[in-house]
Amino acid sequence: MKKPVKYLCVAVFVPALLFAYVYSHDGARSAAGSDTLLLLLPDAVDSSTPAVREWLDAAGEEGLHLQPIHDSEFLNPLSSFHARGVILPDQLHRAANDVLIGELYRYVRNGGNLMVVYDACTWDLNGRFPPGDSRLSSLVGVRYALYDEYTTMTMEPAQVTGTSAAMREIGIPPGSFVPVDNDGNLDRWRQVAEREDADSRFAFATYQYGNVDYPLFRTLGDFDGTVLLRSKRWLAAGYRQEELGHVLFVNLPLGYLASRTDGLLLHSFLRFFAVHMLGLPYLVTVPDGIGGLVFNWHIDAHSSLRPLKILADEGVFDRGKFSVHFTAGPDVDEFGDHKGLDVLHDAETQKWIHYLLARGDTIGSHGGWIHNYFGSHLDDDDEGEFQKYLEMNKDALERVSGTRVTEYSAPVGNQPSWVTRWLERNGIVAYYFTGDAGLGPTRVYRDGKRDAPDIWAFPILHMGKDASLEEMGFDDVPISAVRDWQLAVTDFTVRQHAARLIYTHPYGAERLFGTLRTWLDYADALQKQGRFRWYTMTELAEFLTQRESVRWTVLQVAPGKVTLRATHPKTLAHETWAFPQESYGDARVVKGQATVRMQDGMIFVTAGEGRQLSVEFSARGDVDRSAPESTEAKR
């Protein structure tokens, strides 16, 4: 894909069921249950449009239940929805009438939970800002959408900061936020101290660019809740209590950013609202609920083989199974330069491919035959010219390796949408991606649509504006900072029970070998404790695709009793659910095979072989009473 850009501001009905909500990853309509979130949409918005699917996909990837509902259904006094919270999305729900605004106030004040995103309900039905400020200002706890006062400057791009505790709470990985001084200048990433100064601020950073400004509404007044993020002058995100209910206000265009390959904040706030604020269970994104990393190696020139040998001699490739990608042609910068690996004819390159396969690594395709030429010339409209290089690279690797190539990485990160579609048509299930940085495996949305229906993107982790070890070396990042970042992202995946991708080239790793060894030793220790794993892109992509066929239900079977019921057409093996211990306890397997463990404030239920599972829990206070409060609040 092209380099990331900074973003400037731009201006159901269902019968009431007593208990159950059956969740379907493909978005099939079903009755909402007590662990469900509702995405509130205007009647004119079709729930199958890409902008809506983007929200539903994000929730599904996070293992959450999110169901669209239209305004008329929400307002219908004969309707009843057993759901834990309502989300007002940006872009999709800018306009609202006073009746809906009043119902939202009643819903929250009677015990409902509401997430208000950016410009949701800031317009009247004529597409204009109402006089004064947003009609939801009193609900979210701060005045905003102040068009009468600021006109064309109602929204402004600004640097967004938070404390280290807030960044951790909303699930931002280390390196996607870095320290910032009082003048807004980004410092190098550093390990956060256990007792961080309350005044210390951390700002979001993007790969290659570093500093990024996000569009915000100017806000006025003191916020009486908990501030999560802010700019120098305005509230960016915070949550508060309003009578019996709670409101999370995110003054950032989450959907807009996600549609432009910056989906980290959308995913993070969905998870924060559902799990941290509401205590909802979720389907974990990694096998057995064990977090880990994909270590993606890019080998693109014959000069890579010398550092590759040094790393191999030091036992690096005996530490875990990695995703190792090769550019297969004989040239690198221009045709005839003979700097390439020449996979089809070079015996040394072939030896390394078989060496890595023997250690359990997955061999992938790194672009199209001639690394630098391909990466620098590839464009959105040149499929006819460059498709042959993708074919040649993939075919050469399959001939030499004797295995099917199922993963891909783009030279210099250049990933036009047509390449993604070609990859999916040709059996690739996963690809490295420089957009959506900081996320786990995801489906990419660009220009108002999803790139391809089934293939999984694996966004990179980065440390400020650097991602690969050689970039950190070129920028003279202190070795101690590189080491601390590697350890911190490993801890992040363990704590989040999630997977992320780190990438590098052999010559970058060779320069920082001492740091690399310390990191691998640390990962080894965590792996022996059963808390960490190395994954390949293909392995996770296949797991996540299988996970999409899981159907699961949360039933309140009696006061203080909740049952998880799950099915899969083939097997539930390795699927894992997380239930917050503050809300649930006393898990007991009633049907099927599963193991139960308590860890990091969660009850993890991991399914064994079998197509059906039933697990009973005791439900603590809020879970037992939240459904009637939240669903009947507006009545």
State where each predicted segment sits:
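Catalytic beta-strand/loop cores that center a nucleophilic Ser/Cys/Thr
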Residues: 150-243
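Metal-dependent polysaccharide deacetylase catalytic core of the NodB/CE4 family, i.e.
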Residues: 122-123, 135, 143-161, 316-419, ...
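Extracellular ligand-binding/catalytic regions of CAZymes and related secreted enzymes
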Residues: 23-33, 222-225, 233-235, 240-297, ...
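Catalytic grooves of carbohydrate-active enzymes
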Residues: 292-300, 461-539
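Surface beta-strand/loop "capping" patches
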Residues: 538-582
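Helical hinge/lid and interdomain linker segments adjacent to catalytic or ligand-binding clefts
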Residues: 47-130, 324
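C-terminal beta-strand-rich structural cap/linker in extracellular carbohydrate-active enzymes
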Residues: 98, 599-634
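A glycine-rich, often tryptophan-bearing local segment used as a flexible ligand/cofactor-contacting loop or short
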Residues: 94-187
